[in-house]
Each structure stands twice: as C-alpha cells, then as structure tokens.
Design a protein with these regions (language model features):
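Conserved acidic/glycine
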Residues: 1-61, 66-70, 234-281
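Glycine-rich ThDP/TPP pyrophosphate-binding loop and its adjacent helix/strand module
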Residues: 116-280
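Cofactor-binding active-site loop characterized by glycine-rich and histidine/acidic residues
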Residues: 37-167, 186, 191-193
Length: 281
C-alpha cells in the first residue's frame, strides 16, 4: 500500500493551473466565514460552553463537506452544527436542533444526510460504518464523512472501526483534528490498512485537494481514507491562531487578486441578516 505523506497547498495560478476554479476558491472562503459566524452567534446566545464545532476547524469542515452530493452523509460529533450548515441544512433547522434534546433528533437528521451524533465515539462510528456498508452493498457510490478527534479514532474502539472500514473497503472518509503539531496519528491508521494523509489544518486549499482525491477513490470503491488535519509548524514557528484558517485564505485569495474588503463586508452583512432572522432563542 502506498504511504501517504504530509501535504501543503501548492502554488496556484489562475483557474486552470490550480485545478480549483476562482469561483470554488471564493466559495470555500465564504463557507468558512459562515461557519465562523455561526459558531460565534451560538456562543453569544447559548454561552461559551455551547459551540457549533467549528472554531479553529473551519478549513477541514468546509473542505470535506462542500462538494458532497445530497445523498452523501456526514457524521458530525456531538454539537457539530457547522458541518450541517455546509451540507446544506437551513439555518432555521440548525437553530431548531440547537434548542432540542440531542436524543430527539435522529429522524430529522437522517432526512438531511446527517448521521445523528452519538453519546460517545463508539456509537458515532457504529452508525457511520452502518451507513457506509449500506452504500457499498447497494453500489450507490454514496459516501460518508466522519468528523472526530484524532486521539479518539486511533485508540481503543476507534482502531477496530478503522480496521473494519479498511477490510471492507468502505466508502468513508475519516477527517480528524490533532490538537498539536507534535501529534502524529496518520501512521496508526496506515498500520490498520488505511491510507493516512497529514495536512495543514489551517489551509483549506490543501485540505480540499486531499479530500477531493479521497472522495474520488471512495466513489470508485477503492478504499477509505484517514485525513489528519493538524497545526502546521514552519521551523520553530507555529502557524496556529484562532482565526488562522480564515486569515490564511484571505492572504491566499489576495495573492490571486480575488480578495477585497468589500467581498468580506458583503458576505458578512448578508449572513448576519440571515442569522438575525432565525437565531432568537
């Protein structure tokens, strides 16, 4: 099996050279901005203990979700509302879920391609694997994207689910977050038969390229993929910060002549109006 190495975004020129259109690049940025704003609104309304699972993870959430098809499924962790937003769930529905009890949601989630979060990682993974097994059995070419913490996936019961996914060649992507650049979880996934790729978790372009390749393989029935999104270190300097994914993308778009203050202002104003309409608790 081919060993997967760390990936960073390659330099990109205009549409053809980067293989990612300018329209898609702006869409990635806009989706990250919406995820950040949703998380901030939820924190403001429901308190700091309640978030949308997006703060610091916008690049991975957006890159792994933005190109999914309607019948693909995502498996967010408990409280994981930003992946649902990118998947296409309406804001009104998201705030309805926010007010509800988690165990009252499975049917509503399933109708929108959302696998209801479980009480623990084992419950979450069991439901995700069941959905992936169904997709493979019916040859539907649908896939499942699991969002989780790297440590949870690469120890104890998580390793058993990785082994099953690899053995059955299930159409599933495990998108996980490492809290430190010193952590290295992808080799553990490779030990269990999955291609493991490490990518800069604050670089949405890099994550998008990795995810796009993984999605292609999953739809072809080749193999599942373990994608480790982690803080990147350049020499002794860590590139981590509360807004680094958004800041990085703004800098990237600026280099391509695609970013302006007006773009950000317009996107922010538009989504603020949408939030104001539905977020009264």
């Amino acid at each position: 099996m081919t060993t997967r190495k760390k990936k960073r975004a390659a330099p990109a020129g205009n549409d053809g050279f980067s293989l990612i259109s300018n329209e898609k690049l702006i869409a990635l940025y806009a989706a990250m901005l919406r995820c950040r704003m949703l998380d901030e609104r939820i924190r403001a309304l429901a308190g700091p203990g309640r978030s949308a699972f997006g703060r610091g993870h916008e690049a991975a959430v957006v890159a792994a979700t933005i190109d999914l098809l309607p019948k693909d499924a995502i498996s967010p962790p408990r409280g994981g509302l930003t992946p649902c937003l990118v998947k296409g769930v309406r804001l009104k529905t998201i705030f309805t879920w926010l007010r509800a009890q988690p165990d009252a949601l499975p049917a509503r989630y399933a109708l929108r391609g959302i696998i209801a979060p479980g009480a623990d990682i084992a419950t979450q993974l069991k439901a995700a694997l069941r959905a992936a097994q169904l997709a493979r059995a019916t040859k539907s070419k649908n896939l499942v994207v699991v969002f989780a913490n790297c440590a949870q996936l690469t120890r104890g019961v998580g390793l058993e689910f990785l082994r099953i996914a690899a053995a059955e060649r299930l159409p599933i992507l495990f998108v996980c977050h490492a809290r430190s650049s010193k952590e290295d979880f992808a080799p553990k996934a490779r030990d269990y038969g999955l291609p493991g790729i490490t990518v800069d978790g604050d670089d949405v372009v890099a994550v998008y390229r990795v995810v796009s390749e993984a999605i292609t393989h999953a739809r072809r029935g080749n193999w599942p993929t373990f994608i480790e999104c982690k803080p990147w270190t350049v020499g002794d300097r860590k590139k981590r910060g509360a807004g680094s994914a958004l800041n990085n993308m703004e800098a990237y778009l600026s280099r391509k002549g695609l970013f302006s203050t007006k773009l950000k202002t317009d996107l922010t104003a538009r989504f603020t109006r949408e939030l104001d309409k539905v977020s009264q608790l």
